Regions:
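Sec-dependent N-terminal signal peptides
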Residues: 7-13
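Positively charged n-region of N-terminal signal peptides that target proteins for export
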Residues: 1-6
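Basic-flanked hydrophobic alpha-helices used for secretion and membrane insertion
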Residues: 25-224
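C-terminal motif of bacterial Sec signal peptides marking the signal peptidase cleavage site
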Residues: 18-21
Length: 224
C-alpha cells in the first residue's frame, strides 16, 4: 500500500514539473510594443499616452487601400525587413500556431509579394484606386502576434523601386518600443485583464478615426 502511495506521489510531482515546464515555454506575448498605422493628425493622443513609456520610436512611410472591401497595407522591402528584425512579422506554422518570419521569399519578376490566408493564394493582382498591383503569394503571414482581421487583411511587400510607383493612399506606420510591457496577451492568470483594459482605453482615443487608424499591441524581440 505504501509503495502504491509513493508511486502516485512521484507521478504527481512529475506531472506538476511537466506542466510547469510547458507553462514556462508558453509564449505569453508581452505587449512591449505598439504598431500604429494612420495619419499623424489622428494618432496624437496615442503617441502622448505612451510618450513616457517609449524607449524607441520607429516611423515608416506606407500605403493603404481597400480590395474587395478589405484593408490592404503596402510596404516596401526595407520596411518589411525592419518588421522581420523586430520579430513582429509572423507566419502560420501549424493550424493554430505561428512563428516569426525570418526572411522574405524571393521576389518574382514584375510582381510583389502577397501575404494572406492560404485559401486566397491564387490571387494574381490587387486592384487599388483603379490600378492593378501584380502579386505572387508569399505565405500565410501577418504583422503582430495574431492576425487581426479588423486591422489588416492583405499585406503587399514591394521592392523599393516598385513601391514608389504604386498609386495608393500614403500614410505613416509607427512602431513604438516600450520600456515596460502593458500586459500579456496570454496572461498566466486567466483573470488578468491588464492588457484588455488597456485596449479598451486606447480604443476610446481613436473611436472617431476607426476607419483611418489601425492599432495593435505587439511583442518585439528588442535588440535596440
Amino acid at each position: 500500500m505504501m509503495k502504491k502511495q509513493l508511486s502516485i506521489f512521484i507521478l504527481s510531482i512529475l506531472l506538476l514539473l511537466i506542466v510547469g515546464a510547458c507553462s514556462k515555454n508558453e509564449n505569453r506575448f508581452p505587449a512591449n510594443g505598439v504598431l500604429i498605422i494612420g495619419d499623424e493628425n489622428h494618432i496624437g493622443a496615442i503617441m502622448n499616452r505612451y510618450k513616457e513609456n517609449m524607449k524607441v520610436h520607429e516611423a515608416f512611410s506606407v500605403k493603404t487601400g481597400r480590395f474587395d472591401q478589405k484593408r490592404v497595407l503596402i510596404i516596401n522591402e526595407s520596411t518589411a525587413q525592419a518588421m522581420i528584425n523586430a520579430k513582429i512579422f509572423r507566419k502560420r506554422d501549424q493550424a493554430s500556431l505561428s512563428k516569426t518570419l525570418d526572411t522574405l521569399p524571393n521576389f518574382p519578376k514584375e510582381s510583389s509579394l502577397l501575404f494572406i490566408n492560404e485559401e486566397e493564394k491564387n490571387i494574381k493582382s490587387i486592384e487599388i484606386e483603379g490600378s492593378k498591383v501584380p502579386v505572387t503569394y508569399g505565405s500565410d503571414a501577418w504583422l503582430g502576434n495574431k492576425r487581426d482581421y479588423g486591422a489588416l487583411w492583405y499585406i503587399i511587400v514591394a521592392k523599393n523601386s516598385v513601391y514608389k510607383e504604386i498609386k495608393a493612399n500614403e500614410t505613416n506606420m509607427q512602431l513604438l518600443h516600450l520600456k515596460k510591457s502593458l500586459g500579456d496577451e496570454n496572461p498566466k492568470i486567466s483573470t488578468d485583464n491588464t492588457l484588455i483594459n488597456e485596449k479598451v482605453k486606447v480604443r476610446k482615443l481613436i473611436r472617431d478615426f476607426e476607419e483611418e487608424v489601425s492599432l495593435q499591441f505587439v511583442t518585439i524581440a528588442d535588440g535596440l
